[in-house]
């Protein structure tokens, strides 16, 4: 056997000859012969698209409304923040602020560890402005603090107990802009009752005086001088009593005393009745009558 025959046998064993006269070995045609990964080999001629390796990225967890509304999100803050963020008088302002900030940093890291605290707050702020669920959750918290319940949250409370304020009876004892029966004191109700009784008595006296005005006779012009003098003197005495009573009432009001009682109201109504009767009768003394009264006073 010649050398050429031996070379032909080797070429047949090792591989096939290419068009340019070079030899390609069998392990180059089949990389798996030597245990190589097919994706690690490079071919000069056209590559099969199915053999292209792509780097797959892990899915990135985003901060969503569902994550913020989960048990580790905002409900956790609403439950534990009042206990963990208490301000102590025995600590300095720096220590209280540090404790306050540390609570929210730990909460943010447990909820979304991929972001820094500053970035987390920015994400929460932007998400809270755009997401409808977070806005509704925030409005429900505000309504709960104000004691306002809407929709299915309203219990079976009679309409009479709700009054006109729309506030539940449990929240009516709190400070409110609306005045209820419980907020008015007993003194105010008593003063209002006295004022009502005084107005009622005076109105009844006016009705009596109006009825008496229609019963006057035409013989009033023929009264004696003694009657005129008596009526004029009585008118002056009545005016003095009215002025004295008015002064006393003003002094009592300025000193913070209560309104007049029932007896004082009766006396005041009698004085008002006499004064109105005298004025309605037009029993005003003339110049001659006043002169006669002065003469009587001199005796």
Curated annotation (Swiss-Prot):
Q: What are the GO cellular component annotations?
A: replication fork protection complex
This protein's source sits in the domain of life called Eukaryota
**Any single biological process term in GO:** DNA replication checkpoint signaling
Cross-referenced Pfam families, in alphabetical order?
Answer: Swi3 (PF07962)
Q: Which GO terms describe its molecular function?
A: DNA binding
Biased composition range(s): Polar residues: 39-54
Give the main location.
nucleus
**Region named Disordered:** 34-54, 205-246
* Compartment(s) of residence: Nucleus
InterPro entries under this entry?
Csm3, TIPIN/Csm3/Swi3
- Stretches of Acidic residues bias are at 215-228
Tell me yes or no: is 4Fe-4S among this UniProt entry's keywords.
no
**Which keywords does the record carry?**
Cell cycle, DNA damage, DNA repair, DNA replication inhibitor, Meiosis, Nucleus
| General function of this protein | Forms a fork protection complex (FPC) with TOF1 and which is required for chromosome segregation during meiosis and DNA damage repair. FPC coordinates leading and lagging strand synthesis and moves with the replication fork. FPC stabilizes replication forks in a configuration that is recognized by replication checkpoint sensors.
Q: Which family does it belong to?
A: Belongs to the CSM3 family.
Q: How does it assemble?
A: Component of the fork protection complex (FPC) consisting of TOF1 and CSM3.
Q: What is this protein called?
A: Chromosome segregation in meiosis protein 3
| Naturally occurring in which organism (per UniProt) | Kluyveromyces lactis (strain ATCC 8585 / CBS 2359 / DSM 70799 / NBRC 1267 / NRRL Y-1140 / WM37)
């Amino acid at each position: 056997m010649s050398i050429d025959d031996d070379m032909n046998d080797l070429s047949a064993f090792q591989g096939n000859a290419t068009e340019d006269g070079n030899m390609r070995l069998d392990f180059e045609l089949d990389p798996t012969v030597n245990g190589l990964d097919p994706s690690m080999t490079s071919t000069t001629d056209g590559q099969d698209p199915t053999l292209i390796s792509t780097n797959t990225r892990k899915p990135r967890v985003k901060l969503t409304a569902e994550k913020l509304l989960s048990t580790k999100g905002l409900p956790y803050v609403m439950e534990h923040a009042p206990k963990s963020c208490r301000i102590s008088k025995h600590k300095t302002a720096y220590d209280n602020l540090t404790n306050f900030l540390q609570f929210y940093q730990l909460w943010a890291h447990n909820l979304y560890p991929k972001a820094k605290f500053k970035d987390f707050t920015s994400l929460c702020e932007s998400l809270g402005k755009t997401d409808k669920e977070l806005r509704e959750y925030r409005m429900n918290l505000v309504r709960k603090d104000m004691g306002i319940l809407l929709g299915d949250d309203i219990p079976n409370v009679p309409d009479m107990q709700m009054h006109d304020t729309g506030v539940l009876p449990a929240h009516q004892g709190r400070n409110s802009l609306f005045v209820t029966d419980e907020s008015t004191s007993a003194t105010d109700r008593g003063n209002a009752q006295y004022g009502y009784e005084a107005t009622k008595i005076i109105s009844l006296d006016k009705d009596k005086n109006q009825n008496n005005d229609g019963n006057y006779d035409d013989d009033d012009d023929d009264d004696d001088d003694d009657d005129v003098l008596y009526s004029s003197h009585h008118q002056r005495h009545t005016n003095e009593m009215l002025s004295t009573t008015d002064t006393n009432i003003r002094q009592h009001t300025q000193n913070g005393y209560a309104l007049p009682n029932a007896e004082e109201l009766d006396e005041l109504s009698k004085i008002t009745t006499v004064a109105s009767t005298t004025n309605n009768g037009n029993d005003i003394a003339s110049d001659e009558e006043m002169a006669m009264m002065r003469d009587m006073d001199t005796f």
